[in-house]
Amino acid sequence: MAKIWEKHKGYLPALKYVNLTTRTCFRSIRIEGAERIPQDGAVILAPNHCAALMDPLLTLVLFGGKPVVFGSRSDIFANPKVAKVLRWLRILPIARECNGLSEVARNFDTFKEIIDCLDNEVPFCLYAEGTHNPEREMLPVKKGIFRIAKMAQDQLGVPVRIVPIGVNYEDFFRGQGRIGIRVGEPMEIGEEFAKRAGLAEADIYRELCTELRDRDMALIGPERTRRHDRKFLRALAALLSLPLFAVCAVGSLLIWLPYEIIMRGMEDKAWSHTVRFAMHFIFPVLWIFHIPFERLLNFYRHLFEDLK
């Protein structure tokens, strides 16, 4: 079996299209502090996790055309065909205790692959909360990310750095919002353990989890504010734009109608950006209609909220 970090046929061309499609789902994607990501050595990325598969897609945008390997919960690998596609996408399965001891035991094979990635200077991205949470308040960070980093450092004998990343969604569920991605200063695992020499291992991991969560929360930042003035001019613009909105609604019917049907059948609305991405991925010729359709929809929604 080919190593997951190795170049494989079709990946880079597909990655360019994937990154372009991701950008079409948002009004803007602003990246700050990308220069803080080490360009060599063993690097583990630690973003907050808000929006299912959209979060890894935004990480790919952050890295441009460079390869990144991801960790994800093992239950989505149950179907062999899906597992094959996920591996092609450079995603590794990581089992949790709730999956049972037999599944957790398989993590050792995954850990070997992660360490192999780090040894070959391919970044590994792990969402340390363990699951997504469509809120600005993060869930508690799990210690697994630090265990992996410590294991890699012990086996490779090189510094392993964990990079905090904060992803700020203007809207967790609606399209064409603004995205802010901020990268923090790396945490070198050896230095972090040295600072806490004398503490029990459990206390070290507890402090590290708290610190990573605090760093990510600081990077996420506050909720983006918007203007509420010029109501008359905005109302006039809304009225004049209605013919364009109607054309765009009809033109993008094959995107927004399946999207609405799919999302109504899903309990977990955090998948909304992922489903929207899938529709854009399948129907690129309809971007010209769907992008202005969603932007106008947001414009009308904000206007109605301000006029109440």
Residue ranges, per PLM feature:
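Phosphate/oxyanion-binding loops and surfaces in catalytic or ligand/nucleic-acid-binding neighborhoods
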Residues: L92, P186-G190, R215, L219-P222, ...
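Transmembrane alpha-helical segments and their cytosolic interface motifs
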Residues: F232-L254
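Long, hydrophobic, amphipathic alpha-helical segments used as structural scaffolds
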Residues: I220-E223, G251, P258
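Compositionally biased, charge-rich terminal segments
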Residues: M1-K9, D55, P222-L239
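Long, charge-rich alpha-helical interaction segments
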Residues: R196-K231
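Soluble catalytic domains of membrane acyltransferases
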Residues: I4-L199, L257-K308
